[in-house]
Amino acid sequence: MQYWGKIIGVAVALLMGGGFWGVVLGLLIGHMFDKARSRKMAWFANQRERQALFFATTFEVMGHLTKSKGRVTEADIHIASQLMDRMNLHGASRTAAQNAFRVGKSDNYPLREKMRQFRSVCFGRFDLIRMFLEIQIQAAFADGSLHPNERAVLYVIAEELGISRAQFDQFLRMMQGGAQFGGGYQQQSGGGNWQQAQRGPTLEDACNVLGVKPTDDATTIKRAYRKLMSEHHPDKLVAKGLPPEMMEMAKQKAQEIQQAYELIKQQKGFK
């Protein structure tokens, strides 16, 4: 009920013997309270809707990526289950993720339409869009190889989310570098295949994670580090619309960034 503020304001004015102008003042104060409460309730409703859409779209697009290679195998389903495990999805949340994954596997899944809808609810929040794309890239590389059809789907996703080809290619390099810190996958030289990371991280890997060059100065590297940490701060992302279930992945990404930065500082000798 959006009138409680006005009712209480008028009641308090009458009890205090405020007369006509006291009632008017109580009514105005109550009106301001009702408006503030209404805006807050609308924000929470929009926030829940944004988180629900982010969650559903994430797993729908995962399903679409998997189906783009052809028939969905048991291995593909196992990989999807592993990603759900990483997000600590259980019970109703896991069932919802599985249902969304199946929706994405349909032959007529409207990818471009879904991406436009997703972009519109993000309201230009690039950190949310970036997190979504990073999750999809991880899903595409999870089986150890990047199928040409998966790459084509990723390009469509990036295009509809307003990410240029150059930005997307940089994301790929950042994910490749991050694989050395997060136990993921790395790309084989000269090809599109990715394999389980076996070597330790190098300065080049760390710089790729931060999107900088080994020759960049300390100021440039620190600026890139702070920007990435701000964009991947789990609490900030959840406040902007990231589903709480995906906070763990945001934490893991932030840890990769932190580890990469520490290695760069050690290798280049700055604090």
From Swiss-Prot:
Q: What is this protein called?
A: Co-chaperone protein DjlA
Q: Which organism is it from?
A: Escherichia coli O157:H7
Q: Name one Pfam family in it.
A: DnaJ
- Spell out the subcellular localization from the entry: Cell inner membrane
Residue numbers on the Periplasmic membrane side:
1-6
Topological domain, Cytoplasmic: which ranges? 32-271
Where do the J domain residues begin and end?
Answer: 205-271
Keyword Cell division annotated = no
| GO CC entries | plasma membrane
**Its biological purpose:** Regulatory DnaK co-chaperone. Direct interaction between DnaK and DjlA is needed for the induction of the wcaABCDE operon, involved in the synthesis of a colanic acid polysaccharide capsule, possibly through activation of the RcsB/RcsC phosphotransfer signaling pathway. The colanic acid capsule may help the bacterium survive conditions outside the host.
PROSITE patterns recorded for this chain? DNAJ_2
UniProtKB keywords: Cell inner membrane, Cell membrane, Chaperone, Membrane, Transmembrane, Transmembrane helix
Segments passing through the bilayer: 7-31
**UniProt free text on domains:** The transmembrane domain is a dimerization domain.
Q: Name one GO molecular function term.
A: protein-folding chaperone binding
Q: How does it sit in the membrane?
A: Single-pass type III membrane protein
Describe, as the record does, how this protein assembles with itself and its partners.
Homodimer.
Membrane in keyword set = yes
Which SUPFAM superfamilies does the record cross-reference, listed alphabetically?
Answer: Chaperone J-domain
Q: Please name the InterPro entries in this protein's record.
A: DjlA, DjlA_DnaK_co-chaperone, DjlA_N, DnaJ_domain, J_dom_sf, TerB-like
